[in-house]
Amino acid sequence: MRFAEAFAAKDFDRVRALLHPEIDFRGLTPRRFWEAGDPDSVITGVLRLWLEDSDEVRALEHVETDTVADRERVGYRMRVRNPDGDFVVEQQAYIAERDGRIGWMRVVCSGFRPLD
């Protein structure tokens, strides 16, 4: 849940503090597969591209968490506005901690879905 809140707030310093220095990160968006192995790469090479400067997160609408064996599942939905209009974005993240931080993470993203 802390990751979803920090990401939706575009608080990348807070995101960085949550990530283990040797994070194993992989993500899947509708058009691309993403990989990163350290917090700076996750932030600059992935998250800042997923939520660009022009993307205004209007609301973190829904967050749910659960446990799947040794992984935590975090599902979250955001309303986003940018010059192209209003969108909803949903992501499912699976997380494992290492030394009290996120050390393993897999994220699947719906992409920016236009709102009528």
Q: Model-predicted segments: where are they?
A:
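Acidic surface patches and DE-rich sequence motifs
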Residues: 27, 82, 97
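Short hydrophobic/aromatic-rich beta-strand segments that constitute the beta-sheet cores
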Residues: 25, 76, 104-105
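Short beta-strand segments that buttress and anchor functional surface loops
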Residues: 74-83
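Short, aromatic-enriched amphipathic alpha-helices that serve as compact interaction elements
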Residues: 1-11, 18
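Residue-level preference for beta-strand/loop junctions
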Residues: 70-72, 87-89
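Short beta-strand edge/turn micro-motifs at domain boundaries
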Residues: 88-116
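Hydrophobic/aromatic beta-strand elements that line small-molecule binding cavities or substrate pockets
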Residues: 59-66, 78, 90-96
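A solvent-exposed, acidic/Ser-Thr-rich amphipathic alpha-helical stretch
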Residues: 14, 20-71
